Each structure stands twice: as C-alpha cells, then as structure tokens.
Design a protein with these regions (language model features):
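C-terminal extensions of enzymes
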Residues: 137-179
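Short acidic, gly/pro-rich beta-turn/loop elements at beta-sheet edges
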Residues: 12
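Phosphate/pyrophosphate-binding betaalpha-module
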Residues: 32
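Shared catalytic-loop signature of beta/alpha-barrel
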Residues: 18, 24-27, 35-153
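Divalent metal-binding pocket/active-site signature
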Residues: 9
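Ligand/substrate-recognition segments at binding pockets and active sites
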Residues: 6
Length: 179
C-alpha cells in the first residue's frame, strides 16, 4: 500500500503511476483531493495499481457516485465520518454490488467487526498501539479489549458483549471528565 493522503495533483499522479507499477503495490491510497472524482476515475483507468479512496467521503450517495464513475478500485471509508456502523454497512452492501473491495480506514474494533461481517472486505488495517501525545490513538487510552494479531490474523472474541471493548480506567486521570 502506498499512502498519498491527497498530496498529489492529477498531473503529478499521472507521472508517478507508471514509475510505481513495477513495485506492484496492493493499492495507492488517496492520490488526489477527495473531491476530484473525475481525476480519480482517470487515474483508475490509467494504471494497473488499484486506486483507493473514500476516507474523506461522508455518505453512501458519494460512494455510489465514486463506484458508478469507476473512480476507485478499493473503498476505504472512515466509519466515524460516514455515520457509524449502520451507514458503513450500507456502503459495504453497495460495494458488494459493484464487486469492489472495502478496507475500512484505520484499525479499531468497530472496523474489525465491519470487515468480518461482509464478503466485500478482504482485510482490515491494523496499527500497533504505542504511546503518543496526540492523535487518533486516544481511542486506545480510553478502551481495553482490542485484539492482538497472531501470525497476521485477528480473532474476535464471541464471549464478550457488544464490540468487545471495556473502559480503560487506568488512563482516566489524564483527562478532564465532566458529568
């Protein structure tokens, strides 16, 4: 996987793609700005590298437009941005109807459940937990229960309720909590 995080313009991406093809990356993530759907479509037709996007898309209507224009080969929605698990499941169903794989943006327990609940998802992203001062890692300070991969695979525990997370009281003293 190669991450561009919308850092390229269309012309630069068109120059880079032929140079990257020999490395056979699994996908190229967000090469151009998220709103440049025509640019995504042009790049997706230009290369053998699957183009992924959707991290900055917010509705299943937007994903339908991306799919109808054949703008992406891999959907990578952000569950928190699209409206949660229910909205993400609608996008998964849409992706299945277009035979497009879904690899939700970021790890975290809700995405693991979404990945395991649809044929459209061949894998989940996984980020090892390590201490940082700021960022999306706040999730890991607040909750316990994220699975540890074994030989590259994650198993979800069927014997725990809900998503399988519990509050991590060990770190609460680091936050201002109001009731």
């Amino acid at each position: 996987m190669l991450e561009c995080y919308m850092g390229w313009n269309l012309e630069y991406a068109k120059r880079m793609l032929p140079k990257l093809e020999r490395f056979e990356p699994r996908w190229l993530e967000e090469p151009v700005l998220a709103d440049d759907i025509d640019g995504y479509a042009e790049l997706n037709q230009l290369t053998s590298i699957p183009i992924s996007g959707g991290e900055h898309e917010f509705t299943h209507y937007g994903f339908r437009q991306l799919l109808e224009k054949r703008a992406i080969s891999v959907i990578q929605y952000d569950t928190n941005r699209v409206g949660g698990i229910t909205a993400a499941r609608k996008i998964n169903a849409l992706a299945e109807s277009f035979s497009i794989p879904v690899i939700p943006h970021a790890g975290q327990m809700h995405n693991y459940h979404l990945t395991m609940s649809t044929l459209a998802s061949p894998m989940s992203e996984f980020f090892p937990v390590h201490d940082v001062e700021i960022g999306n890692e706040l999730f890991y300070y607040l909750f316990k229960g994220d699975p540890e991969p074994v030989n590259g695979f994650i198993d979800l525990d069927d014997d725990v309720p809900g998503l399988g997370l519990t509050l991590n009281h060990d770190h609460f003293d680091q936050f201002n909590i109001t009731e």
